């Protein structure tokens, strides 16, 4: 409940920043978001579970984004268990980093990185090694430098033999070279890749959470506007794949 209270408090800040971007009808839903909560409980009332509430469902709402992330993380966990058991696959977690950019370049850079990602996953080596993936764009904000870092988190399904078969295995160094090549940015110094040995809650939450942290995008109106514009662009591009 403490986490919910914190998110609800941030919703008050969110209302001020989102107002210029939505119509009055949507704004009414945002103002009333989660003002009604219905719980189910056991006989002792010691264990309670949220049963129903009125949600605005805006992707930037701190409460709705938090609740959706928890739900999506559970969905990913169940999906992974099913694929491991029924398809006999394993998973790797890949993070593709990029240089920081200013607000005015964020939109164009995300569009370019989205294109680069699609290009990389059409490479013969990657097609042979991967059996499916889920990706998520995350944007973080550096307050001291006033710039943004867009990067991709990618959950990739691979054959069990991937880790021992040299024909298909892609090392961290090779992932880095591929990412540098498709982006054309030799300054990229690292990518992170690791085998998921079990359903790691931290990695699943990274995949499930929204593209930005509310602690970042609710700093001020300027930062919020940059996140809002750029994340809408990414959603549109991703839907076109």
Task: Please report, for each region that a protein language model flagged, where it lies by residue.
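Positively charged, glycine-rich low-complexity segments
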Residues: 1-150, 156-201, 213, 217-221, ...
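Conserved small/polar residues in nucleotide/adenosyl-binding loops
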Residues: 234-241
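Intrinsically disordered, low-complexity regulatory regions
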Residues: 204, 224-227
């Amino acid at each position: 409940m403490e986490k919910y209270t914190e998110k609800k408090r941030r919703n008050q800040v969110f209302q001020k920043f989102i107002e210029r971007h939505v119509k009055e009808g949507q704004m009414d839903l945002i103002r009333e978001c989660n003002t009604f909560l219905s719980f189910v409980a056991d006989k002792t009332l010691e264990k309670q579970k949220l049963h129903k509430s009125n949600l605005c469902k805006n992707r930037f709402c701190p409460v709705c984004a938090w609740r959706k992330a928890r739900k999506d993380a559970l969905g990913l966990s169940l999906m992974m268990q099913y694929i491991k058991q029924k398809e006999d696959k394993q998973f790797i977690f890949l993070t593709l980093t990029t240089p920081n950019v200013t607000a005015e370049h964020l939109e164009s850079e995300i569009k370019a990185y989205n294109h680069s990602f699609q290009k990389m996953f059409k490479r013969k080596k990657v097609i042979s090694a991967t059996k499916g993936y889920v990706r998520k764009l995350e944007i973080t904000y550096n307050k001291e430098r006033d710039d943004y870092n867009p990067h991709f988190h990618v959950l990739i399904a691979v054959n069990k033999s991937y880790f021992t078969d040299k024909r298909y295995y892609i090392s961290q160094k090779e992932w880095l070279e591929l990412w540098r090549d498709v982006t054309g940015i030799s300054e990229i110094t690292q990518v992170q890749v690791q085998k998921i040995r079990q359903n790691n809650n931290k990695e699943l939450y990274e995949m499930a959470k929204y593209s930005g942290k509310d602690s970042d995008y609710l700093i001020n109106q300027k930062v919020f506007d940059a996140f809002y514009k750029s994340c809408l662009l990414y959603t549109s591009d991703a839907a076109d794949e």
